[in-house]
């Protein structure tokens, strides 16, 4: 990637606001403050073409744009990305991504007009084939001890600084084979957090094997689709998966775990990757 101009530090990820609290059914005195997460309209443009508008926590927007481009199949890898630039406007932020001209056919195929709901990855998709698109199966990988998966989820919790401040964000983390989370991203939208993580992995040249993705949310169909698109073999979620997510995980050779909490977990697909 030749060019990367970002200044996400210009946009706060949370702010303080005046509140009136109720405690034990009793109104408390006015004048107290609370920290709340920011969400900002972020428009993604590829080669000058407006593609999608999302509500996003305004941090790591370069990673978000890269991860979105990768998991949506707009680009095949970082070699297809020429540069990323961020522009602040009065009504939000525009992320301009320059991609190889050879990717423009895929861009037109995946073009969607998305707006409105936080982390709504499927808003604006017009046909079912656009939703259930072909994704290459994840590569086979060695089994990881279940203890390392549990450790990874516990490690992710310690990386959720924005959630600690606001209680409003999801996190997605990348853990190595030992279960240590080496990279994490947060966002008000769970899909956005995962896109940020995948973009960061690609930008930093971190291979998806061996290791796992851990998320502080449920595992929806699109979370599995993004995981498989990135070649990540294991997805561990703190909450439940959906039936469609399980079917896709089985189809794409992704090991899907849900209810990963403390010393417990449920494995829904490809349990051969999890060892005692």
UniProtKB/Swiss-Prot annotation:
Q: Where mainly found?
A: cytoplasm
Fetch the SUPFAM superfamilies from UniProt. Cytidine deaminase-like
Q: Which GO terms describe its cellular component?
A: cytoplasm
List the catalytic residues.
120 (cysteine persulfide intermediate)
Which key words are in the record? Cytoplasm, Molybdenum cofactor biosynthesis
Disulphide connectivity of cysteines: none
What InterPro entries does the database record attribute to this sequence?
Cytidine_deaminase-like (IPR016193), FdhD (IPR003786)
Name the GO terms of the biological process aspect: Mo-molybdopterin cofactor biosynthetic process
What GO terms are given for molecular function?
A: sulfur carrier activity; sulfurtransferase activity
Q: Where in the cell is it found?
A: Cytoplasm
Recorded family membership: Belongs to the FdhD family.
Function of the molecule: Required for formate dehydrogenase (FDH) activity. Acts as a sulfur carrier protein that transfers sulfur from IscS to the molybdenum cofactor prior to its insertion into FDH.
Q: What is this protein called?
A: Sulfur carrier protein FdhD
Native organism: Bordetella parapertussis (strain 12822 / ATCC BAA-587 / NCTC 13253)
The gene from which this protein is expressed is fdhD
